[in-house]
Regions:
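Hydrophobic face of amphipathic alpha-helices that form TPR/SEL1-like repeat modules
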Residues: 27-29, 63, 96-97
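Canonical tetratricopeptide repeat
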Residues: 24, 59, 92, 126-129
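Structural marker of alpha-solenoid helical repeat scaffolds
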Residues: 14-15, 49, 82-84, 116
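Structural signature of tandem alpha-helical TPR/SEL1-like repeats
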Residues: 1-10, 33-45, 67-79, 101-112
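Register position in tetratricopeptide repeats
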Residues: 31-32, 66-67, 99-100, 129-133
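Bacterial c-di-GMP phosphodiesterase catalytic domain signature
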Residues: 26, 80
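TPR alpha-solenoid repeat register
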Residues: 21, 56, 89-90, 123
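Residue-level recognition of tetratricopeptide repeat
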Residues: 18, 53, 86-87, 120
Length: 135
């Protein structure tokens, strides 16, 4: 992680407004550390530079979920999923719905993601970690 973080920060030192790099660093921090506030700041900057980018909205929705901000998270993830119904976005949206007790909706989102990409590892990891059985 440290080498990757150093590389991304080196890019940002040369181009502090590189939205894809801001997003990559923020998303990596979200998934590999508990530095969620820092990750959110990076991804928020990325989204300000590239509004409407579904990948960045997914990242920001995911870090908001990690911060317990479920309403904001769900809103961003739904918008990202509508624009780009990628299975990874589906995995994140499903997990946010599950955390809010909306289990049927979560299962529907995960099943849709698995229809798009059978055996998608991120969806399978989420449902396994949460102990979910899909029909």
């Amino acid at each position: 992680l440290q080498a990757m973080e150093d590389d991304l920060r080196s890019i940002l030192a040369r181009d502090p407004n590189h939205a894809a790099t801001l997003n990559a660093l923020g998303y990596s921090l979200t998934n590999r550390t508990q530095r969620y506030e820092e990750a959110a700041e990076l991804i928020e900057r990325a989204l300000a530079l590239s509004p409407g980018d579904p990948a960045i909205m997914d990242s920001l929705g995911w870090v908001y979920y990690k911060l317990g901000q479920y309403v904001q998270s769900e809103s961003l993830l739904r918008e990202a999923h509508d624009a780009f119904p990628d299975p990874e976005v589906a995995a994140h949206l499903g997990e946010v719905l599950w955390a809010q007790g909306r289990e049927i909706e979560a299962k529907d989102v995960w099943q849709d993601g698995l229809r798009r990409v059978n055996d998608h590892p991120i969806i399978l990891e989420a449902i396994d970690r949460l102990g979910v059985a899909l029909p």
